[in-house]
């Protein structure tokens, strides 16, 4: 057996699709899969995908997004890893490890958030540094949504009996955080907007959001769901952006607050509150959010969100590990925002 490592452009598209269908466990038509992969890999901007091939067959993959981060006040490119997977019958040959070691030799520091049990077992053994864990927040608005989330959490899938659970509202009224000023305003972000985004609050580690990322989300294929992009203003000043995703599932609508980009800490609670109310007005029966920022976590808790098991985060190399705090790590990281179901 001879395993070759090739780039995305040098591999068979049909073989990649077959491998990723097994990785994601999704049941999509060929047309939908082609559209999704063109957006996911072709339109995202900087990134690199390594594929392990046994002859013409794709047997392993490791993908990465490359985007700017603010690290202790300096802007630096960071490589976010995702889609680390190889066919079970090839794991004994170290195919996945070989892909990761190849990626670890690149010049950018690397970030990994969450992942499979296999991933979380291997990264510490590869001497990655563990960052502070990321809180996992959940707010179930209806009884059916709560049943769906529990069955998915415990069994890995949403069971058919969930649809028989009545759509009883568990939360009748949610508090609304007052705006920071009388002239505060929330607007929908238009895909035609090309203005440069303001710098974010001074975190020790946070992604540097730009218009290209917002454009990428705004042009996502319909099968991914719908991304809600909101802009926040105070006295005409652009003070933040929120990115959320709405998915229509069999049991109802699930939403996820993917990321908040705020220019200062004091507007975060208002932005979280307005984003949540927007998602509820759009029909969300449950809202999820990952957050490591203490201000964001406090705002979510005050609105009734419940903390679930935290999500591990890792950094390579140890010698460049960010220190201090706070960190602002959310679902705006590689493919974490694009989980299905």
What is the predicted function of each stretch?
Residues 1-53, 58, 74-76, 80, ...:
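Short amphipathic alpha-helix that is part of the acyltransferase structural core
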Residues 10, 17-113, 133-135, 234-266:
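Conserved donor-binding loop and adjoining core beta-sheet/short helix segment
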Residues 33, 96, 210, 271-272:
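Amphipathic coiled-coil/heptad-repeat helices and related helical stalk/stem segments
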Residues 42, 104, 219-222, 280:
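Residue-level signal for alpha-helix termini/capping positions
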Residues 98-99, 213, 217, 274-275:
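Short, hydrophobic/aromatic alpha-helical segments in well-folded domains
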Residues 110-173, 220-221, 228, 234, ...:
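Active-site/acyl-donor-binding loops of N-acyltransferases
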Residues 206-232:
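Oxyanion-binding "anion nests"
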């Amino acid at each position: 057996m001879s395993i070759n490592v090739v780039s995305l452009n040098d591999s068979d598209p049909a073989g990649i699709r077959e491998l990723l269908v097994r990785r994601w466990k999704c049941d999509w038509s060929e047309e939908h899969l082609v559209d999704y992969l063109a957006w996911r890999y072709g339109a995202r901007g900087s990134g690199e995908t390594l594929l392990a091939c046994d002859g013409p067959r794709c047997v392993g993959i490791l993908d990465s997004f490359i985007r700017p981060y603010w690290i202790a006040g300096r802007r630096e490119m960071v490589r976010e890893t995702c889609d680390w997977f190889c066919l079970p019958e090839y794991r004994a040959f170290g195919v996945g490890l070989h892909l990761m070691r190849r990626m670890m030799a690149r010049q950018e520091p690397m970030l990994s958030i969450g992942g499979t049990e296999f991933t979380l077992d291997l990264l510490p053994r590869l001497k990655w540094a563990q960052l502070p864990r990321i809180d996992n927040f959940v707010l179930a608005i209806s009884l059916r949504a709560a049943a769906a989330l529990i069955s998915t959490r415990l069994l890995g899938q949403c069971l058919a009996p969930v649809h028989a659970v009545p759509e009883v509202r568990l939360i009748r009224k949610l508090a609304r955080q007052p705006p920071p000023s009388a002239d505060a305003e929330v607007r929908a972000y238009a895909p035609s907007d090309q203005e440069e985004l303001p710098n974010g609050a001074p975190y020790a580690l946070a992604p540097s959001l730009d218009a290209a990322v917002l454009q990428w989300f705004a042009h996502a294929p319909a099968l991914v769901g719908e991304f809600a992009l909101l802009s926040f203003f105070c006295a005409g000043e652009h003070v933040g952006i929120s990115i959320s995703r709405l998915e229509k599932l069999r049991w109802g609508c699930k939403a996820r607050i993917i990321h908040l980009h705020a220019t200062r800490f004091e507007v975060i609670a208002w932005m979280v509150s307005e984003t949540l109310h927007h998602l509820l007005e759009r029909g969300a029966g449950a809202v999820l959010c990952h957050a490591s920022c203490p201000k964001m976590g406090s705002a979510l808790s005050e609105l009734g969100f419940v903390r679930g098991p935290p999500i591990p985060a890792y950094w390579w190399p140890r010698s460049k590990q960010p220190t201090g705090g706070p960190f602002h790590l959310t679902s705006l990281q590689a493919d974490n925002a694009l989980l299905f179901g």
